[in-house]
């Protein structure tokens, strides 16, 4: 990494993640998926190498991008057994450390979950507080929202789930 004498005051990053659902409609009420750290009862499972948390994957990707550290796939490749079934909060914590090493803090995060099912908004506040807890970011600077694709494409056919995140990083003082 080159040393900059004029570090930008602000940097913005965007992240994206998508995972397929399994094809089995599981009637087992113990089946759940994890989104932004919160377990949600759902009749399908996410197919993933780690815990498959698209919200936190997108957030980690956005943080890494904001500070010029590449992508989540570069730091936590799905070909590495070390990350098998890993909790996605670990990815966000490590991305946050990279930002801090480069002189930045996360000032704001906006995460959108894209799916037809399950419904996300009943869990949004809990997700916001979960992320705030392990990142030490004020919950009012974390936003969680959800949308559908109006039944268009693979996500519209409920074959998977996606997330996008954008973060604003500011210079540490």
From Swiss-Prot:
Any one GO MF annotation of this record: 2-C-methyl-D-erythritol 2,4-cyclodiphosphate synthase activity
Site (Transition state stabilizer): 49, 148
EC class (word): lyase
Pathway named in the protein's UniProt entry: Isoprenoid biosynthesis; isopentenyl diphosphate biosynthesis via DXP pathway; isopentenyl diphosphate from 1-deoxy-D-xylulose 5-phosphate: step 4/6
InterPro entries xrefs: MECDP_synthase, MECDP_synthase_CS, MECDP_synthase_sf
UniProt catalytic activity: 4-CDP-2-C-methyl-D-erythritol 2-phosphate = 2-C-methyl-D-erythritol 2,4-cyclic diphosphate + CMP
Protein name: 2-C-methyl-D-erythritol 2,4-cyclodiphosphate synthase
Organism: Ehrlichia ruminantium (strain Gardel)
């Amino acid at each position: 990494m080159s040393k900059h004498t004029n570090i930008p005051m602000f940097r913005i990053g965007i992240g994206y993640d998508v995972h397929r659902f399994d094809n089995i409609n599981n009637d087992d009420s113990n089946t759940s998926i994890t989104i932004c750290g919160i377990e949600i009862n759902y009749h399908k499972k996410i197919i993933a190498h780690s815990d498959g948390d698209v919200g936190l994957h997108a957030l980690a990707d956005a943080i890494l991008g904001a500070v010029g550290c590449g992508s989540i796939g570069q730091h936590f490749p799905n070909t590495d057994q070390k990350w098998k079934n890993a909790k996605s909060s670990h990815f966000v914590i490590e991305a946050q450390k990279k930002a801090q090493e480069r002189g930045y803090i996360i000032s704001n995060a906006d995460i959108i979950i894209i799916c037809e099912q399950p419904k996300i908004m009943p869990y949004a506040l809990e997700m916001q507080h979960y992320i705030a807890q392990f990142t030490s970011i004020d919950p009012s600077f974390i936003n969680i929202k959800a949308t559908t694709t109006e039944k268009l494409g693979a996500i519209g056919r409920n074959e998977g789930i996606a997330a996008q995140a954008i973060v604003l990083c500011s210079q540490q003082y």
